[in-house]
UniProtKB/Swiss-Prot annotation:
Strong histidine N-acetyltransferase activity has been detected in ectothermic vertebrates and not in endothermic birds and mammals. GO terms for molecular function: L-histidine N-acetyltransferase activity. Residues 15-151 form the N-acetyltransferase domain. It catalyses: L-histidine + acetyl-CoA = N(alpha)-acetyl-L-histidine + CoA + H(+). It is an enzyme of class 2 (transferase). Disulfide bonds: none annotated. SUPFAM superfamilies: Acyl-CoA N-acyltransferases (Nat). Enzyme responsible for the N-acetyl-histidine (NAH) synthesis, which is a major constituent of brain and lens of ectothermic vertebrates. Its EC number is 2.3.1.33. This is Histidine N-acetyltransferase. The lineage of its organism: Eukaryota, Metazoa, Chordata, Craniata, Vertebrata. Keywords: Acyltransferase, Transferase. It comes from Xenopus tropicalis (Western clawed frog). Pfam families: Acetyltransf_1, Hisat_C.
Amino acid sequence: MKIEAVPGAPQDGEFEFVLAAEKEFEEIISISHGIYGGLDYLPSRYHSWINEKDRMVVLAKKDGTVIGLLSVFVVDGGETALLEGLRVAPWERGRGVAGVLQRFCIKLVKHRYPSVKVMRLTRDDKLSAKELTKYRVIAKQGILLLSFNAPDLASRLSSIPLPPAASRPPPPIELTPEDVRDVFLERGGLLKDLLPNQTIIQDWQPFQALPGNQDLLRRKTLCWMVDDLIQPQVATLCTAPFPVPAGPLCFYLNIDVFGSELQSVQEQLLSHLHAHVPKLPADVRCQLFLPPNLWRPMADFCTLVLGLHLEKGYTEQYLLEADI
């Protein structure tokens, strides 16, 4: 779908910018091979993204061929533009396509949504000195990437050796829709002491704990857990598993962790695994985003106690912000 003329947008005769449609799906998948180490979420989300309210999925084309994609999602009551899903065709990488596409998308979102004040994005690689001057770092989390075979783990979950019940924290509490509503009170409500900058980071997507984001997150299939309803020290947010290109029948399980009480994090991880693993058919990539100081003890727990495979060493997720 053609995009209207956007005042101030980059003018480059080489590129045509259009809104993505169903017909471009296969072409986009063909330029996405190897993206995000086989954990690319776009194949599972593309069809809903192109129809989602307040989201624009913008394609860059050259000679009629798709060479780049970037999604812009307006959240936080119309004040924030989330930049997601960036990719450039392999033969065009290193030629400035990503920068041109990002600049166009920023002009487009400001043209359509004048209330937008900042852009936010998440990254999982080291930031250059130039990037550190361009963006504010709003939050930093450790990334723990694990893998396992679901039927194998399901057969072992009930027999995993754990400390005696008397020395373990109380069982995790799954939040009801009414409890979740309390998360979106002023300054994060129930979770105000746990959220980085009052921001809920859900599977790479940052949302401020504002009433305007409540319905948006309620539409997702999420499981929220806390260790205590009055004064939680740990909260976790698990996204429903979805298929990824890492392998045949491979599913991705994402768990975002807020809080640093180790035993409560372990208990909540086990509860999420009990809920999802028995329903999955084969291999799983499980990614936990957690406070950096928890990475090593949780890596040891997952490998030595749960018998999961550590896919890679310590890396970090950065939540970045810039005024626009």
